[in-house]
Regions:
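Structured interface patches
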Residues: 1-164
C-alpha cells in the first residue's frame, strides 16, 4: 500500500485512516515462512501541529516449530508500529525519524521491516520448555527419560576425583 503524504504534510490536523490486510508470506525466519495468513494493519497517518506520525497495530498468526522441542506452535502476535515522518533529515542518520523525500510511503515495506525486527530470535512453545533429550530424543515436556547426560571429557577427571 502506497500512501501519498503531500496533502497530509500540508494540512494541519488531517488524519488518514489505514485499515488493510498485508501478505507476509515472504517473511523468512530460520529458513521457514511462518506467517501464512495475511496480517491485519490498522492505524492512521496524522499531521498534528506539523508533526506527521504513522501509528498502527499489526496483528498476525505465527506458526512454527518450537526451537527446543520441535512441537508445532501457532500464536497470535500484535505489536505497535510508530514512526515520525519527515521530508528530509537535517543531519545524517537519525533513527527517530523516517525520511520520505518523495512524499510517498510504501507501507508494505515498512510493516514487513518492522515485523522482521519484532519477531523473537527464538520461538518457544512456552517459557519453561525443557526441549528434547540429547541422548534419546524424547520430548522432556511430555515424559521423563532415564538417559544419563554425556559427561564432558574435560570434566571427567574431576568426576573420578569425586568418586574416590
Amino acid at each position: 500500500m502506497i500512501i501519498e503524504l503531500e496533502s497530509i504534510f500540508n494540512t494541519d490536523g488531517l488524519k488518514v485512516p489505514v485499515d488493510y490486510e498485508l501478505s507476509l508470506a515472504s517473511v523468512e525466519v530460520s529458513g521457514l515462512n511462518p506467517i501464512s495468513a495475511p496480517a491485519k494493519v490498522v492505524g492512521c497517518v496524522e499531521n498534528n501541529a506539523g508533526i506527521v506520525t504513522l501509528t498502527a497495530k499489526v496483528q498476525f498468526v505465527y506458526e512454527a516449530p518450537c526451537d527446543r522441542c520441535a512441537v508445532d506452535v501457532k500464536r497470535e502476535f500484535t505489536f505497535p508500529v510508530e514512526h515520525t515522518l519527515v521530508v528530509a533529515l537535517e543531519s545524517g542518520d537519525n533513527d527517530d525519524f523516517l525520511e520520505v523525500p518523495n512524499m510517498r510511503l510504501n507501507l508494505d515495506e515498512l510493516v514487513e521491516e518492522d515485523v522482521n525486527l519484532a519477531l523473537p530470535s527464538k520461538y518457544l512453545c512456552n517459557e519453561d520448555c525443557k526441549g528434547l533429550c540429547s541422548v534419546c530424543g524424547k520430548n522432556l515436556n511430555k515424559t521423563q527419560c532415564d538417559c544419563k547426560a554425556p559427561i564432558d571429557p574435560r570434566m571427567e577427571v574431576l568426576l573420578k576425583l569425586l568418586e574416590e
